[in-house]
Amino acid sequence: MGAKDVSEKILVAYSDVAADILNVLVCNGQRLFEPEMLQEASVVSQYKMDGKLHQQERDVAKFVIDKATNAIITCCGFENQTKVDNRMPLRVIGYDGASYHNQQNNAELYEVITFVLYFGERHWYAPRNLQGCINRRCDKLPDTVRNDYKINVYEIAYLTQEQIDMFQSDFKYVAEYMVQKRTNKEYQPSSGVIKHVDAVLKLLSAVSGNPNFELIIPDVEEGGLNTMDAMIARFEKRAEARGEARGLNIGENIANTNFATEMIKDGEPVSKIQKYTKLTLDRLEEIAKSLNVKLVM
């Protein structure tokens, strides 16, 4: 498992953060979930293919416990995505299916629901359901016999200010950063004390691609810093010391190039890539050449 993958999981694994995400993103701000209602669930499952046993791992999984009966009523999975995944519905089916498979001998079944937290600056352009992933179909079969499976994708960089203000956990600062990074290219942090300082900085480092967030952790811990504005001041001081540009700006051209690169790898057509990146055909051809692939026209 890569270090970046681990960093993305840490913050959401805290029950106060997971409950807050459910309350804001899923329940529109209603405080229906409490941290005490959530318990750790196994993120690892196994399946057999080609006669061999394989292992798959979710990012985070939480059981929702009924207070009255102490029974599991739901398993909530959380998947953190910094990039668009064209096969995300297939991954989610695999995770959810494994959770249902594990219940085969249970007297009663609980539901399994997965939430995809997408931290990219561009809209999620990939399929959000199984049928959107299918390329080959038998036209002799009616649609009524075809099964589908949708995924729940939440675009963190496109949350409204009203939604951001609803957050009561540290996830507020991550959402705030992603939205401001997309709209302003510069981050002006709000006030407030951060509870999970280490986890917030590691997640910001992972979703922004900027290692300075994680590199200031020793300074933050030594100085007892626990507010975002104080940590950003330390971040900028470190950036200046390394001769980097002040602030949290990312070059628009670099961002567009990186995004186009991922879309070209995914086999997306030129028209779709240009819609999201505004790059010229010549530039896209240069990127494709560097990847040793052909553009899809």
Language model regions located:
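Elongated, amphipathic alpha-helical interaction scaffolds
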Residues: 1-297
